[in-house]
Amino acid sequence: SFACQSSEVLEQAESKADLIGGTVAGLLSLVGVVADPLRSPEHIVLSQILEKAWSEGEDLSLETLISRLVDPPFKKVGVFPLDTFYPSDKRMELAMRLNSVLASSSFALWAQGEPISPADLCTPKDGTVPVSIFYLAHLSDQERMFFVALLLEKLLAYTRTLSGTTALRSLLYFDEVAGYIPPTA
């Protein structure tokens, strides 16, 4: 789900923009769309849908997001009418691609279990430091990128809500980063 973030995150313009941008980029990568956050109608409209929902304190499911892509809760994007900026047939095409992911049997597993909560992942329970391991080898490249993007965006948003400390609170270890972080010369 695309759960509404805490007020601490949403009140910080940079944090909110980073979270929305990363979430939308991850979602679009899942359906093979490479989108420029400043120029791509797909990215801009999905970002506005998320921002509107979260500013109203609303959690969105993928189903709701797809429905709102077909019939967005706004009529203008910038100064242009929505249908001029991103025509309804193009929105429907993207909605169909997202719906195909939602309807696939392999994606059904994503809807099961507890939603990922960085607070739950990082907070000691009964004096024991939690260890969480995410095994992603069975996922396609697009699914891995989607999951990693959402996880890292949620972790970053969570850490921005915490006060400073001199003690280590958590450690993120990312093994086998090939394909995520390009090598440098």
Annotate the PLM regions.
Residues 1-185:
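P-loop NTPase motor domains
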